[in-house]
Regions:
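A glycine- and Lys/Arg-enriched "phosphate-lid" helix/loop adjacent to the NTP-binding pocket
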Residues: 101-168
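Walker A (P-loop) phosphate-binding loop of P-loop NTPases
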Residues: 15
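NTP-dependent small-molecule kinase module
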Residues: 2-3, 26, 140-206
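Walker A (P-loop) ATP-phosphate-binding motif of ABC ATPase nucleotide-binding domains
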Residues: 7
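Conserved lysine of the Walker
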Residues: 18
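Hydrophobic anchor at the beta1->P-loop junction of P-loop NTPases
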Residues: 10
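Hydrophobic positions on the alpha1 helix immediately C-terminal to the Walker A/P-loop
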Residues: 21
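ATP-dependent small-molecule kinase phosphotransfer cores
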Residues: 34-124
Length: 206
């Protein structure tokens, strides 16, 4: 069997378990000696990580449009310096990508969806995700998980209604689209790990 080099995205609101799953898949790839790169957004290289610190710093209070532009700046650096070099050459695991911008900045904050899509299209050009996991969590578990987080950033401080709007946005993006897989983070973690791993195996071995 030959190995495909897909771009795989893990999406979801804070506390939904996406980072736990991406770390699990990373460890699996390391054990199997499968070449991959793991990137987070905002982040992925020195320039994008610098912008990330600005966005998430609790001391900052940017308006929603400034936030949007900072996310795009970080993504531009990430694509130019990291993703382009690895696209189709290595499996790419992304902790957040373009759907996060639409879910948070459009569905959550009310910014223009057409503008967001236009800039994303300009940045991505021919880069396309092959598989997108969207982790969903109910309000009760969300509140519980956020309370347990040791390192809180500015986006951990929004109210539950905001996160519910964002999550509904994610589900709208995923509706009737084959690249998307909804992961119910209210289920046992071991079940979700198995589901994610099985889906990934199906696309990396063709």
């Amino acid at each position: 069997m030959s190995k495909k080099k897909p771009l795989i995205v893990f999406e979801g609101i804070e506390g939904s378990g996406k980072t736990t799953l991406i770390n699990y898949i990373s460890k699996f790839f390391l054990r199997k000696k499968i070449k991959f790169i793991k990137i987070r957004e905002p982040g992925g290289n020195k320039n994008s990580e610098t912008i990330r610190k600005l966005i998430l710093n609790n001391k900052n209070n940017f308006n929603s449009f400034t936030d949007l532009m900072l996310y795009f700046a970080a993504r531009s650096e990430n694509i130019d310096l990291t993703i382009k070099k690895n696209y189709n050459k290595s499996i790419i695991l992304l902790d957040r990508f373009t759907d996060s911008t639409i879910a948070y900045q459009h569905y959550g904050m009310g910014l223009d969806k057409n503008l967001i899509n236009k800039i994303n299209k300009s940045l991505l050009k021919d880069i396309k995700p092959d598989l997108i996991f969207i982790n969903v969590v109910n309000s009760k578990n969300l509140v519980k998980r956020l309370r347990l987080r040791k390192l809180r950033n500015r986006y951990d401080n929004f109210n539950t209604k905001f996160y519910e709007k964002v999550q509904r946005g994610y589900l709208k993006l995923a509706k009737n689209r084959s690249k998307y897989v909804i992961i119910d983070s209210n289920k046992k973690l071991i079940e979700n790990k198995k589901e994610v791993l099985n889906k990934i195996k199906k696309i990396i071995y063709v």
